Amino acid sequence: MEDFVRQCFNPMIVELAEKAMKEYGEDLKIETNKFAAICTHLEVCFMYSDFHFINEQGESIVVELDDPNALLKHRFEIIEGRDRTMAWTVVNSICNTTGAEKPKFLPDLYDYKENRFIEIGVTRREVHIYYLEKANKIKSENTHIHIFSFTGEEMATKADYTLDEESRARIKTRLFTIRQEMANRGLWDSFVSPKEAKKQLKKDLKSQGQCAGLPTKVSRRTSPALRILEPMWMDSNRTATLRASFLKCPKK
């Protein structure tokens, strides 16, 4: 699974996922399914934000990378992917600037057009079940919830899907592609089922000649892309980085 993740996701996303797991003391060599899930969630959050701007009239518009109007205000502020301290700093800044109610839990995005925080969910289960779990945890009408599945289903608060149909279709297509690529490599069943995941982990460790009881060292290097990304996020001038082409999964 780890090899699949490194092949199929943008290196910037992989770096952010590694950083997030290390922050919580999790070993991506062992919890490979979580590694894949975090990368998938990060990519969906980036795709949700991609190309969406607000013009001078306060209207939401979709702008391609090479469009001369690319300096317009970004519609979404990306919170997911930052370390917790920085993320809360951004949330507090947004609340102080917009008057939005501070959420109890860290959200994934802030929508400057609708003036609301957004919680993005990506599930391998039924969308309505995951939606209810999110809603019961957040318990706030001020945080908008939008759930996507790997089968093309989605569910959002009050059936308000925020994005246009084409933008949502891009996300659904990407998720379906990830599912197909996992299935082609025999990884999908273990990704969905914890029981199958344990079997896959034992198989991977055996093939690598590792012992599950031994700690595995994780690289602590920080790539140039990650060093550039964080200050760009703080300045809300991240177009070039976030618009980088996502890597396609090479065929086995």
Swiss-Prot record:
The keyword Membrane does not apply. The active site is at 80, 108. Signal peptide: none annotated. Keywords: Decay of host mRNAs by virus, Eukaryotic host gene expression shutoff by virus, Host cytoplasm, Host gene expression shutoff by virus, Host mRNA suppression by virus, Host nucleus, Host-virus interaction. The keyword Transmembrane helix does not apply. One of its GO terms (molecular function) is RNA binding. GO terms for biological process: viral RNA genome replication; viral translational frameshifting. The record marks 28, 65, 202-203, 206 as: Important for efficient shutoff activity. It holds the Pfam family Flu_PA. It is found in: Host cytoplasm; Host nucleus. Its main location: host cell. The record marks 195, 198-199 as: Important for efficient shutoff activity and nuclear localization. Belongs to the influenza viruses PA-X family. Plays a major role in the shutoff of the host protein expression by cleaving mRNAs probably via an endonuclease activity. This host shutoff allows the virus to escape from the host antiviral response. Hijacks host RNA splicing machinery to selectively target host RNAs containing introns for destruction. This may explain the preferential degradation of RNAs that have undergone co- or post-transcriptional processing. The probable endonuclease active site in the N-terminus and the basic amino acid cluster in the C-terminus are important for the shutoff activity. The C-terminus acts as a nuclear localization signal. The C-terminus is recruited to host protein complexes involved in nuclear Pol II RNA processing. This is Protein PA-X.
